[in-house]
Structures are given as C-alpha cells and as structure tokens.
C-alpha cells in the first residue's frame, strides 16, 4: 500500500503525512469526541474515483446511515432521478435557496451550482442518524467551519492517473474535452488531500468499503 501511494504522489512533500492516515490510532479519538447524536462524514475525491459507488454501498449496508442529497443546477443524466440522485433546480430557484441561507455549503463545480440543504443534514443528526455527504474540498471546508470541526473527513484517491482516465472514459457520458478538463481539475483537487482526516486509495471497492466502515464505527 505504501509503495502505491508513493508511486501516485511522488511529487508530494507530505509523503510521511499521507502514509500515516488510517494508521495512527490517535485519529480514532476524534470519533469519540464528537457528540453522539449522529456522526457527519464527508467523502471527497476527484470525479471518477468511485465515491458515489462506495457511498451507495455504505447506505445499503446500514439503515441508520443517510446519504445527503445535493441540490444542483446541472442537467439530469440518463437513469438519474430527481429527489434520489439530486434535487434538480433552476439557477433562479437555487439562488433563492442560497439567499434564504438554506445551505450548509454551496459551490460552483464545472459551471454548475451545487449545495447541501441545512435542514436535511441537521434534522438527521439531531435524531441520531449518521449522515454521509459526497462533496468536493470547497464544500468540505464550509461544512467543517459550520460544524466547528465535528465532522469526519475522508478523501479517496484513484490507483493512478491512468486508471482515472480509464474510468472517466468508460462512463461514456463525457467528451474527450470534458475528460481532459476533469483530469486537470482532479490534479488540483488531489492537492487538498492533507485537509482530510483519512486518505484511502480506491483500487478495490470492497476493501475501501471495509476501511470506511471501521473509520465510522
């Protein structure tokens, strides 16, 4: 595992830091300090790394785990359903929600607006339900500030940039230009890995699933 990380992030000055994630027992103390209403877990990764698949697998495995549904202005893709995958809104409706301070976080990603409704998250936490939010590093910063640090942050990495290109290409939903843009953005996103509590390489969905379960529970 260490060899994989070094190969992927050879340019990084914080190799020792990333290798310590998930290995340092002191990090589990953060979970114990969080007030046990519900635990808020943020999972971030570059597009195509598999976080959506892993989040759905976590939810299917635990009825007391809720996957927050984001509001977005982007167009609905084939097989996506409103209220299940996202709450699809017009730009006007989104900005109205923002002006009413209804979001716990919001950001512009690939020229589209995304946001997480405050009541959707807080109501669940107050009722003892653990919540997972699938967002980027921008949203993670906002949520961390709002929750005063009472959030567990997990960042997923692909096995390699080459594998990430293959995953994006196999989806068949992006043009070559869009894939190139996403790859450029992925490299920028990866630079924020050290803002997270845990960094995991997603070379095997089942293995990452097990590791995240250990982190949460």
Where are these regions (language model features)?
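The conserved Walker
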Residues: 47
């Amino acid at each position: 595992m260490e060899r994989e990380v070094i190969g992927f992030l050879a340019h990084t000055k914080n190799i020792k830091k990333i290798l310590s994630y998930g290995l340092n027992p002191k990090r589990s103390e953060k979970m114990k300090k969080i007030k046990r209403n519900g635990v808020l877990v943020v999972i971030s990764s570059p597009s195509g790394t598999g976080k959506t698949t892993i989040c759905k697998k976590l939810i299917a495995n635990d009825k007391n785990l809720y996957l927050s549904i984001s509001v977005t202005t982007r167009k609905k893709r084939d097989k996506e359903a409103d209220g299940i995958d996202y709450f699809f809104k017009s730009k006007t409706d989104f900005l109205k929600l923002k002006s009413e301070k209804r979001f716990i976080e919001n950001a512009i990603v690939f020229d589209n607006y995304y946001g997480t409704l405050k009541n959707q998250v807080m109501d669940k936490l107050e009722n003892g339900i653990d919540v997972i939010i699938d967002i980027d590093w921008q949203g993670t910063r906002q949520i961390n500030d709002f929750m005063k640090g009472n959030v567990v942050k997990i960042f997923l990495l692909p096995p390699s940039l080459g594998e990430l290109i293959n995953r994006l290409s196999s989806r068949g939903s992006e043009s070559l230009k869009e894939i190139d843009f996403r790859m450029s953005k992925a490299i920028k996103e990866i630079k924020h890995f050290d803002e997270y509590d845990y960094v995991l390489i997603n070379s095997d969905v089942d293995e990452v699933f097990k590791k995240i379960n250990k982190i949460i529970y």
